[in-house]
Amino acid sequence: MRCRKCQLCLSALLTLLGLKVYIEWTSESWLKKAEPRGALPSPTPPNAEPTLPTNLSARLGQTGPLSSAYWNQQQRQLGVLPSTDCQTWGTVAASEILDFILYPQELRRFLLSAACRSFPLWLPAGEGSPVASCSDKDVPYLLLAVKSEPGHFAARQAVRETWGSPVAGTRLLFLLGSPLGMGGPDLRSLVTWESRRYGDLLLWDFLDVPYNRTLKDLLLLTWLSHHCPDVNFVLQVQDDAFVHIPALLEHLQTLPPTWARSLYLGEIFTQAKPLRKPGGPFYVPKTFFEGDYPAYASGGGYVISGRLAPWLLQAAARVAPFPFDDVYTGFCFRALGLAPRAHPGFLTAWPAERTRDPCAVRGLLLVHPVSPQDTIWLWRHLWVPELQC
């Protein structure tokens, strides 16, 4: 009798054990099958800390047979750009590029002085309002670095009165070249008055043309390293953009710390190719550059981590000059081993018919281009309590 009871107990235990194993196995199998449908996507791996290898060729995509294009040849050979006698690089380029004389005038002018990256501030002490350094007690969370041109008075004033107006944690600066220009009106007295009135103009003594926008980036990075090294983020933006500052600040404050430390955020172009049609604004001759562009954020506006300023300067000293500022920035980030991050709230090819649509802008971070008049109109209507979207 006892043996029979023992057998029954043992049988029951074995049955329960088998049932437990079956349930666990079927549950695990179901979860594995269900994962692709219902599981959260894997988080994007954070950018690593910046590094700068001795040989940048592999980082910059030059792993195959070396192209005969001048930029590619220079990048393979380049150690560091000359810090003295910077005109030599351009003189050599003019002599070694066989069809240099056929290049567009703007590109020839750029190449002749492309290695020259040290320019004095245009307004000496006493002749204008020098831009104050960031104090220890007033370090901006977000620096608004707006690329402008001396004659763009209306655009600068529209920015000051709208998205560039004082907000806790932000500071506004405009980046300009010399107001002397080439054959244009003499704007020195007007720009000097503006600098004294607002104290937000960083002016350098170089020719302010589109191909020199890279200079504004590099000189800003130098200024940051000396005068505002602890800024958290820098928005580098054109003066014809519209920025939703509250939304941008909110987004930046929610970033994981690892992302924030190496941020390069905007509307990202990947696998872009040079335009080969002569006469276009972004024409690049095959004898100058071969290959695809790096992933880069559109120059209409993007955000970088402030702590990367000295790193980007080191990278720029070892990346051969390139005429387009946003593409060149992409090369420098690629040299550091850092990838850009795309955000759908950055739209830098904004259609003209939507520039007076506050509901469309309300959910975005940055749109470009927008005229000064539309910038003011948008700003006034974006914050109307009665706005129904």
Curated annotation (Swiss-Prot):
Residues annotated as glycosylated: N55, N212
Describe the protein's quaternary organization and the partners it interacts with.
Interacts with B3GNT2; this interaction greatly increases B3GNT2 catalytic activity, independently of B3GNT8 enzymatic activity.
Q: Where is this region: Disordered?
A: 36-57
What cellular component GO annotations does this protein have? Answer: Golgi membrane
Q: Which EC main class describes this enzyme?
A: transferase
Alphabetical list of Pfam families matching this protein? Galactosyl_T
Cite the annotated pathway. Protein modification; protein glycosylation
Residues crossing the lipid bilayer are: 8-24
Carries keyword Transmembrane? Answer: yes
Q: Where is the signal peptide?
A: none
**Enzyme Commission numbers on file:** 2.4.1.-
Q: Can you tell me which family this protein belongs to?
A: Belongs to the glycosyltransferase 31 family.
Compartments annotated for it: namely: Golgi apparatus membrane
Q: What protein name applies here?
A: UDP-GlcNAc:betaGal beta-1,3-N-acetylglucosaminyltransferase 8
What does this gene product do? Beta-1,3-N-acetylglucosaminyltransferase that plays a role in the elongation of specific branch structures of multiantennary N-glycans. Has strong activity towards tetraantennary N-glycans and 2,6 triantennary glycans.
Q: Which UniProt keywords apply?
A: Glycoprotein, Glycosyltransferase, Golgi apparatus, Membrane, Signal-anchor, Transferase, Transmembrane, Transmembrane helix
> Which GO MF term does the entry hold, naming one?
protein N-acetylglucosaminyltransferase activity
User: What kind of membrane protein is this, topologically?
Assistant: Single-pass type II membrane protein
Species source reads Mus musculus (Mouse)
Q: What is its main location?
A: Golgi
Spell out the InterPro entries in the cross-references: Glyco_trans_31
